[in-house]
Amino acid sequence: MAKKIFSIVFLALLCAGMSGQQVPSIGAISGTQAHNVIWESKLYRQVEFLSDSLCGGRATGTRGGTETAFWLIRRFRQLGLTPINGHWSTHFYEPFGRNVIGFLPGASKRHNDSYVIVMAHYDGLGTLNGILYPGADSNASGVVAMVSVAEMFCTMRNIGRAYDSNIIFVGLDAKSASMKGSRALWKMIEDGLLTDPVSGDAVTADKIRMVVNIDQIGGTMSRLKSGRKDFIIMLGREAAGDGSASLLSTCNLKYGTGLELGYDYFGSNDFTNIFYRKVSDQRVFLENGIPSVMFTSGITMNNNKPYDSVDTIDMSILKRRIWLIFHWLERVM
């Protein structure tokens, strides 16, 4: 019986070879498995929840902000991430806010002291004068992208993929309050309070390989030169290394995301400097010498308006952006 089964398998492989078909590579299978945990209706439901009246626009220190933090904690726990210091969230004051932090070891058999931080701010304008500012693009899209990247990495770890760096996923609060959330995260690092739950050692600045910030990744209105809707902007390629741009291009081709790629803020050096170094959460880390990258689709006329709603986001494009960020991160780790 065993010989018969072997013969059938051998003939099948022989026929596949004669017909020019190839057995998929391990990398191709792995990439497909990671893709399969992210789909458009799932993204829609998550962005819809975060921009719903239940979250109230997610203003720092409000019930809606707390609801959002609890949602992040639930998602991190479901994915199998590990809390830091036994707690999923860390608090700061003036204003009162909380960062939500989850940890993913890079490998099981060996544990490295190299770390990549992937973060997105979850706070928004809230409800002002009775008017809800949903903040679907700004920045429910970035939060959902960050959580989706975490889910893809957890999927890969569960099937045996190992990485050279551990990943720390952070939902930041209070960007709109002078980036208090990212400043609180940096203070944790400075004070030695951000500890590796596997080794128990402090995650010090010299161990942080890179920070990746995802801020407003759902827009399609402010387009690049070609006018295509399906694009993505990566700011900070110099910080990520000389080959980061070509690596992003390679991943874009290899994994079929097919996005138009931009490496500055719509061709303006001044605006690139402002958005990369001044107005988003990677600023705090850049000021402290940590290599940092920002992924964005830029500001649109919907941002910070009552009509920044889930229905303005093209989920098929958001999905491809998430896939590309994940595959690029896999390569640079």
Segments from the language model and where they lie:
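Bacterial N-terminal signal peptides
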Residues: 7-16
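N-terminal capping segment at the start of a domain
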Residues: 23-67, 79, 301-308
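His/Asp/Glu-rich mid-to-C-terminal helical/loop segments that flank catalytic regions of hydrolases
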Residues: 30, 296-333
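Acidic/His- and Gly-rich active-site-bordering loop/insert found
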Residues: 50, 76, 93-129
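A non-catalytic alpha/beta surface segment that caps or lines the substrate-entry region
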Residues: 57-105, 262
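Alpha-helical metal-binding/catalytic segments enriched in His/Glu/Asp
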Residues: 102, 118-179, 325
